[in-house]
Every structure is written in structure tokens, then in C-alpha cells.
Amino acid sequence: MSRVAKAPVVLPAGVEVKLNGQEITIKGGKGELTRVLNNAVVVSQEDNSIVFGPREGVANAWAQAGTARALVNNMVVGVNEGFTKKLTLKGVGYRATMKGNAVGLTLGFSHPVEHALPEGIKAECPTQTEIIITGCDKQVVGQVAADIRSYRKPEPYKGKGVRYADEIVRTKEAKKK
């Protein structure tokens, strides 16, 4: 059995926590995040740490406590340091530009694609073939990166498309006559 929930989440300097029943709000330098935790989890704040435990009489309470601890830890890291995803475009004529609060993409379609960014997410294009997405909510940063990648996933023959910077695309060999 995993022991994730037994370790407390240590709060760095400059991070505030508000507990209101099962709702937890974490405020830091990069922003503020709120989440409602499962009823099977007991949450308490002790000094500069948050402690998680199972509620008595609930079957999967330890599993839920471990999940809650991981989610809250990601919230603390997000409001303190933030999260970043980097995408690269590979292909002839594939380009990315910033258009206000949207990312403009030229991906070989008959029309340009514009992806609007949700609140709290920033993107920048240091070059025409790179997109860097940053924000304090890990889930939203990952979802925006996945949405942009889904417009043109890397194809298996030449590897053209939008990919994560650390992604390895396995290429196939072309069919022989």
C-alpha cells in the first residue's frame, strides 16, 4: 500500500492556506487556487504544514487521502513556482504566433487555427516553432498543451506536427515496393 498520505505537505514562505470544511484555498506569489476535497479525507493545518488522514468507516479513505495530498502538493508548488509545458512544431510552414490572449497556429490547414487561452494561463513563442505555456494550475497547463497538440499530432512517418519538447516520436519505415 502506498504511504503518500502519511507525509505532510510543507508550506514554503509566502504561501497562505485557508481551510473551510472540505474546501481548501492556497494563495501564493503566482496566484490563488481552490479545490474541494473528497469527503473521505480529513484535512488539518499544523504550523507550516498540511496533514491528511482517512475518515473512519470509509473503505477507500487512504487512497483518497493520498490523492488529496498529491493534488494539494501540486497546488502549493503551482502558486509558489508555477508549471511549464513546452511544445515544438515540426514541419514545412508550421508556425506559431501570439495574437493577444490566443495562440495563432499555421499547421497546413486551409485556414489558420487560433487557440484562446483560459484565464491564468500565459503562453509565449520565443521562436516560430516553439510555444511555452505557463500557469499555476498543473491540470490546466497540461490540458492547454494537449489541446494545442491535438490540432496536429506528430505523424509516424516523418514526425511532422505539434509535439511536447521532451516527447520522442517513433517513426515508421516507408512501405517498400
From Swiss-Prot:
Highest taxon above the source species: Bacteria
Q: Which Gene3D superfamilies match?
A: Ribosomal protein L6, alpha-beta domain
Picking any one GO molecular function of the record gives:
rRNA binding
- Which InterPro entries would you find in this protein's record? Ribosomal_uL6-like, Ribosomal_uL6-like_a/b-dom_sf, Ribosomal_uL6_a/b-dom, Ribosomal_uL6_bac-type, Ribosomal_uL6_CS
Q: Which GO terms describe its biological process?
A: cytoplasmic translation
Q: Does the keyword Iron-sulfur apply?
A: no
Entry annotated with the keyword Ribonucleoprotein:
yes
Q: Name one GO cellular component term.
A: cytosolic large ribosomal subunit
Keywords for this protein: Ribonucleoprotein, Ribosomal protein, RNA-binding, rRNA-binding
The record, for Pfam families, names: Ribosomal_L6
User: NCBIfam families given for it?
Assistant: L6_bact
What role does it play? This protein binds to the 23S rRNA, and is important in its secondary structure. It is located near the subunit interface in the base of the L7/L12 stalk, and near the tRNA binding site of the peptidyltransferase center.
The family annotation for this protein states: Belongs to the universal ribosomal protein uL6 family.
Subunit organization:
Part of the 50S ribosomal subunit.
State the protein's name: Large ribosomal subunit protein uL6
